């Protein structure tokens, strides 16, 4: 069954879910109950790259409309006015385009903008220098991008990190008269803050294809003269609709004829025989990957995986996908166990894996090492019974079970740290569920993995960072499963 139009509820898909595969012609799957499909053993596929060119072209179209005041000039001329001086525009030639994020669609936008002779600056912590050179863009930090850009486009998923990445604070850092284009996700921009900036002239124009609430009917940005809006048309061209339809049909045909799985959203490639053996390791790999991903801050170059002891005797390919999906899940919106290796490859992340049948300190262990442009992070985990256990982080021995909300702290192994930490959390009425410590040597570097009953605020993180012995504090979240 393939489709891309009407939203459907799980109760209306009973017959469909008895089939082997559901195909979605496009990227969005809000019209498919993936949980119900998974429960019924049905693979859900989509076509995330079939409309990339169309969406990128829409971004360029919005930017050009904004630069030359085309929508307002069109309306004015239809009304019989002839306001040439009022709608004087600006050239794109030699202007600085600041791109926040540079994935698949972003790289196409960069290519088109380069053809317009724009200077392209990119903020993307996960874009390697090698990939930046390949697509001919210059990496900069976010503050620099905000300060120097004439046009700013958004190319990131909506996550906790990117939500309202454009707000009053970031707008203050921008050039006077900057123009902002958002085709990516509603919620990336604080719309009230943008409205104020448009009225004041700080932002001389904005063009949006997406909004915080859709369908958007009473948005605060509507009616503003300097605002160009379209109703989520990014993927709406005849060519894109045809491309995604052909792609999803080919994917489904390949699966039904020879078992090939492409762009599946809800299931790794695991045989019925392997499934019960791999089940506890899948959970362990998800936790290892998520932990490594949340303590890795810059663009990843190399991902090294080692399976030791009992796990080395199993089919480890699905486990590699789970590890990479967990690693990338905190920074990317649509990562799953099937597409994670492809996403990593597209971002020039080199994945290597090895097997060591001989047991080491544990009868079974999985090691994940992540190399970035600045540092290396490692996480090792094992199973106690069938329960996941983290046994090493950043080359420091520790034994920890992971809960939904955690704190990861690096500190100096000196007296007073635990007492200060406990007092601050107690004052904030944050209860500690478990507390795990590890250190390299007496008085040396130490780490702590602390499970707490609820997420902590940014203000509390700042307070914890002020403890004299503390080097860094990171809130971790393991509540949402990727499988």
Q: Model regions: which residues?
A:
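Short beta->alpha connector loops at strand-helix junctions that form conserved
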Residues: 25-26, 41-53, 124, 142-143, ...
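Residues that mark the start of a beta-strand
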Residues: 95-96, 119, 302
């Amino acid at each position: 069954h393939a489709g891309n139009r009407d939203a459907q509820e799980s109760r209306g898909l009973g017959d469909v879910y008895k089939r082997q595969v559901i195909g979605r012609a496009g990227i969005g799957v809000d019209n498919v109950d993936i949980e119900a499909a998974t429960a019924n053993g049905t693979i859900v596929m989509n076509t995330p790259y079939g409309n990339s060119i169309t969406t990128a072209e829409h971004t360029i179209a919005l930017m050009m409309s904004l630069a030359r005041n085309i929508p307002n000039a069109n309306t004015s001329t239809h009304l019989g006015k002839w306001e040439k001086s009022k709608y004087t525009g600006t050239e794109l030639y030699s202007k600085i385009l600041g791109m926040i994020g540079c994935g698949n669609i972003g790289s196409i936008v960069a290519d088109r903008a380069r053809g317009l002779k724009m200077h392209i600056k990119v903020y993307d912590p996960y874009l390697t220098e090698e990939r930046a050179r390949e697509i001919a863009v210059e990496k900069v930090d976010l503050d620099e991008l905000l300060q120097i850009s004439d046009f700013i486009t958004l190319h990131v998923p909506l996550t906790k990190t990117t939500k309202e990445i454009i707000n009053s604070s970031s707008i203050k850092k921008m050039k006077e008269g900057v123009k902002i284009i958002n085709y990516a996700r509603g919620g990336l921009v604080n719309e009230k803050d943008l409205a104020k900036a448009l009225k004041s002239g700080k932002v001389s124009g904005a063009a949006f294809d997406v909004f915080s609430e859709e369908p958007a009917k009473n948005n605060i940005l509507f009616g503003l003269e300097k605002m160009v809006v379209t109703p989520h048309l990014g993927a709406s061209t005849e060519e894109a609709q045809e491309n995604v339809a052909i792609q999803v049909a080919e994917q489904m045909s390949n699966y039904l004829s020879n078992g090939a799985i492409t762009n599946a959203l809800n299931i790794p490639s695991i045989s019925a025989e392997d499934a019960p053996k791999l089940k506890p390791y899948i959970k362990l790999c998800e936790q290892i990957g998520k932990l490594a991903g949340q303590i890795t801050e810059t663009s990843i170059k190399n991902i090294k995986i080692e399976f030791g002891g009992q796990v080395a005797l199993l089919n480890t390919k699905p486990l590699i996908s789970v590890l990479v999906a967990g690693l990338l899940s905190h920074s990317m919106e649509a990562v799953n166990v099937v597409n994670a290796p492809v996403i990593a490859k597209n971002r020039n992340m080199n994945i290597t894996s090895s097997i060591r049948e001989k047991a080491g300190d544990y009868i079974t262990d999985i090691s994940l090492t992540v190399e970035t442009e600045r540092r290396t992070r490692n996480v090792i985990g094992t199973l106690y019974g069938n329960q996941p256990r983290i046994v090493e982080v950043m080359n420091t021995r520790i034994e920890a079970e992971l809960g939904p909300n955690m704190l990861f702290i690096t500190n100096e192994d000196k007296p007073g740290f635990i007492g200060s930490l406990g007092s601050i959390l107690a004052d904030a009425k944050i209860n500690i569920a478990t507390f795990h410590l590890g250190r390299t040597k007496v008085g040396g570097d130490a780490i702590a993995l602390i499970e707490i009953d609820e997420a902590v605020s940014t203000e509390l993180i700042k307070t914890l960072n002020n403890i004299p012995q503390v080097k860094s504090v990171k809130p971790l979240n393991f509540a949402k499963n990727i499988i």
